[in-house]
Amino acid sequence: MKIYIDHQKVNARSQLANLASIGGLLLLLASVVIPLFVSSWAQFSWILMVVGLGMAMVGIYYANRWVRKPRPEEGLDKALKSFDDHYHIYHYPSSFPCDHILLSPTGLIAMEVVNLSGSFYYRNGHWKEAMTIGRALRYIVEERVDDPVTFSQAMVQELNRRIEKEFNGEVAVPVKALTVFIHPATELEIEGTSIPACKLDKLRKQATIVSEKLAAEPYEKLSSFLEHLTVGY
């Protein structure tokens, strides 16, 4: 499998997340310490506190996305490494509705990665996350987990719209969308009908589209387009 990723972009976002979270915490500390030594600044301490809290929360949110291990792209690459070079995976393409997309010989598979521990259920047509105290406390600085069925429908529609616009309707390609849970402590329970969601160890089986093989021209057009969005070549 061919892998496309702009490591400089990922590293830059990781550094910004760390700077924002550390900078916010330093401002919070300053809002407490400065008034102790400069009493005339006491009236401004709340400004530092609000700004610091906001920066810290934003920084922690993006640190969970860009710094937390295991990294989403590493997990996907490992799970799909047995695919041959007719499969191309693109991580974090710019101005694209999904962060990870797989071009296969038979279509496109968009992947929404969830890097959270916890228990998730799909029962009787309803999606539910078991909310623990720890998760509730971290909820504001962690990603939301949408219903995989709703996500899949919206993502497929958006990708079809984007591809039609980009290629003026000249390229038609089957599209599939999956929610992939990569955290080893995740519990995923699905009752009844299957849904477009899986844990990482089941991804290879799910990352397929039963369809005719794409013709060479649309396949190459899609490959070049996604490569340009991902690494800029």
Label the model's feature ranges.
Residues 1-98, 103-109, 114-124, 129-233:
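Surface-exposed interaction regions that form or flank ligand-binding interfaces
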